[in-house]
Amino acid sequence: MTQDEMKKAAGWAALKYVEEGSIVGVGTGSTVNHFIDALATMKDDIEGAVSSSEASTQKMKALGIPVYDLNSVDRLSVYVDGADEINDRMDMIKGGGAALTREKIVAAVAEKFICIVDNTKQVNILGEFPLPVEVIPMARSYVARQLVKLGGDPVYREGVVTDNGNVILDVYNLKILNPKELESQINEIVGVVTNGLFAKRGADVLLVGTPDGVKTFTAK
């Protein structure tokens, strides 16, 4: 089974967590694209979706799934999204696709976070994948200096502007032993919008595509 086939299996497995008549929170990325394809098969059974990125919005609209503004929605039963890394405590690094802020906002609203990944994303310690930090453009150099003080090596992601009009610093060489603490520390730096650690709001259910099928893990 190829990596993409494992992503597809995880994406389709998330369909069973979608409630009929509900509005579904939808993330961003290659694995989520498979979930969107799956969601389109039951588009007549749901009210619609809230999207975390322009890319996902366009894909869903093309498939005939109604997309709502989050401000007009009171309740999201589930949010389905991928991760760049996830540990056994359901802490994640996300934001490889630069949609981390909107992803974090939609995740905060949802009652349940369903994380869908292939088995290459499971790790013991977060940090091998660079940690994305969304930054107000004028604060880029200042924030980079503060991230160096925290032990990281920040690199400006050239040519990338987020859906919110901001820039991304990818922080390398962080060994993240306390994800919740680091998430707070980075978010307290003036000029940071948010960072790609999803530890305070981790996943509730993890669906992992493997060569042997989809494995399900639940937050302890």
Curated annotation (Swiss-Prot):
Active site as annotated: E103 (proton acceptor)
Record keywords, A-Z: Isomerase
Residues that, per the record, bind substrate: T28, G29, S30, T31, D81, G82, A83, D84, K94, G95, G96, G97, K121
Reaction(s) this enzyme catalyzes, per UniProt: aldehydo-D-ribose 5-phosphate = D-ribulose 5-phosphate
Family: Belongs to the ribose 5-phosphate isomerase family.
Summary of the function given for this chain in its UniProt record: Catalyzes the reversible conversion of ribose-5-phosphate to ribulose 5-phosphate.
Name of the protein in question: Ribose-5-phosphate isomerase A
Gene field: rpiA
